[in-house]
């Protein structure tokens, strides 16, 4: 019997990418589906959604409306992920042609969903931490691995706890087995995923070996033929000295750290319920630079959070100057349902928010120009992962710079030493030596 065709579109974070891989695995290995990039020939169309900001939610309905217009007769449409979790039945009301809704904490139910009319699985307390998913990966050379699900921080601006539920760590034996299998199949790098990865080990579904995130990194680094370990996202509150020292000293741990700042103002951080102060954040970031001089630090910043004054914004700019981030993901505050910040009275006007975001991004661009210029004539070890147009190939350094050289597909999955000849903001161009 010929395979049915599956089309999937993934929006949002790396955890969504891994969730999509899990659903692809379940459907291709258990339900006789094969992936297609042509939506018109698909028997099943999935969109895996993000709800961290308002814009992706609006995009969902425009996307599924487009799917309905081009899909073939009899094809099913499923809405999955975080937006599915928090909108639930509203999706059926606004888009009655959707066949099922599957929340971010319920992706293991995908085979049930495709067989049940108007199936809705949005239970954020459902526990998938020990579910044995079938295996599928978009990349042979890099493997995403979930180490926890959910988040219990309840930052006042964030909807994630309402869409992914409380935090539960995945048992070490499951993580280790998945990493080992990925390496045996050719992965050179594993990428550990969780909302707060360095809070790992605080809560399991059942009794399991006690270990924290630093221990997990050390244990996984013993896997033979595994060359690199990356992770996202750690929480600044849990960046103790042990964690920073393991990060700096373990040669398999990539020297790229995501440190979500959100705001440089201690008052705004308190209103956000982040759990740390500006002083704590700077202490951790500067200690990291001291322990690991070649580290690249990325961050998330929200401008115009309710009540943010000009002084508060200047505190954020001060952290930018002191830490000099290699990369920032910056946004205007986006009001999200079910969050405390959405009901705060002192919302910031759009003009002020846009001005602050522009000021932040323009200054960071200047800093980044200075940073990348210093990379010229340096030599980096690069893992090549992606073909580019014009007989070019790209990969990443240990500290997460994107590097492009002339080369063909025979370089995919290989490490090569590259000398940087021309450094741009987004890409470092170089030559293999």
Curated annotation (Swiss-Prot):
Binding site for [4Fe-4S] cluster 2: 151, 155, 158
Cofactor(s) required, per the database record: [4Fe-4S] cluster
KW Iron (keyword) present: yes
Main localization of the protein described in the UniProt heading: cytoplasm
Residues of the TRAM domain: 373-433
Cross-referenced Pfam families: Radical_SAM (PF04055), TRAM (PF01938), UPF0004 (PF00919)
EC number, UniProt record: 2.8.4.3
Family: Belongs to the methylthiotransferase family. MiaB subfamily.
Function: Catalyzes the methylthiolation of N6-(dimethylallyl)adenosine (i(6)A), leading to the formation of 2-methylthio-N6-(dimethylallyl)adenosine (ms(2)i(6)A) at position 37 in tRNAs that read codons beginning with uridine.
Name the UniProt record assigns to this protein: tRNA-2-methylthio-N(6)-dimethylallyladenosine synthase
Species whose genome carries this gene: Campylobacter jejuni subsp. doylei (strain ATCC BAA-1458 / RM4099 / 269.97)
């Amino acid at each position: 019997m010929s395979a049915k065709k599956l089309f999937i579109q993934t929006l949002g974070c790396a955890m969504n990418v891994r969730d999509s891989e899990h659903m692809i695995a379940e459907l291709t290995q258990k339900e006789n589906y094969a992936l297609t990039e042509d939506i018109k020939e698909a028997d099943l169309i999935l969109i895996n959604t993000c709800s961290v900001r308002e814009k992706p939610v609006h995009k969902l309905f425009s996307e599924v409306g487009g799917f309905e217009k081009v899909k073939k007769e009899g094809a099913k449409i499923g809405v999955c992920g975080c937006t599915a979790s928090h909108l639930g039945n509203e999706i059926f009301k606004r888009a009655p042609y959707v066949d099922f809704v599957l929340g971010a904490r319920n992706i293991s139910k995908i085979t049930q969903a495709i067989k049940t009319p108007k199936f809705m699985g949005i239970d954020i307390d459902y526990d998938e931490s020990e579910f044995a998913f079938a295996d599928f990966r978009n990349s042979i050379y890099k493997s995403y691995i979930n180490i926890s699900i959910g988040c219990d921080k309840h930052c006042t601006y964030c909807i994630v706890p309402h869409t992914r539920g409380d935090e539960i760590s995945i048992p070490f034996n499951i993580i280790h087995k998945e990493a080992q299998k990925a390496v045996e199949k050719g992965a050179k790098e594993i990428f550990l995923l969780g909302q707060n990865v360095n809070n790992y080990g605080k809560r399991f579904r059942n009794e399991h070996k006690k270990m924290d995130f630093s221990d997990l990194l050390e244990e996984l680094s013993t896997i033979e033929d595994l060359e690199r370990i990356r992770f996202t996202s750690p929480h600044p509150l849990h960046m103790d000295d042990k964690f920073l020292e393991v990060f700096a000293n373990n040669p398999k741990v990539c020297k790229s750290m995501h440190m979500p700042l959100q705001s440089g103002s201690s008052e705004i951080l308190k209103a956000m319920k982040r759990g740390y102060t500006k002083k704590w954040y700077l202490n951790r970031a500067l200690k990291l630079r001291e322990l690991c001089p070649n580290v690249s630090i990325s961050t998330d910043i929200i401008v115009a959070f309710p009540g943010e004054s000009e002084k508060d914004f200047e505190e954020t700019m001060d952290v930018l100057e002191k830490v000099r981030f290699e990369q920032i993901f910056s946004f205007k505050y986006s009001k999200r349902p079910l969050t405390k910040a959405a009901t705060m009275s002192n919302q910031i006007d759009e003009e002020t928010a846009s001005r602050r975001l522009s000021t932040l991004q323009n200054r960071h661009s200047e800093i980044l120009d200075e940073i990348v210029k210093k990379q010229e004539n340096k030599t980096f070890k690069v893992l090549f992962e992606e073909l580019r147009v014009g007989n070019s190939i790209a990969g990443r350094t240990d500290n997460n710079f994107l590097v492009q050289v002339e080369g063909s597909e025979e370089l995919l999955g290989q490490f090569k030493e590259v000398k940087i000849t021309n450094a741009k903001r987004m890409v470092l161009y170089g030559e293999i030596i």
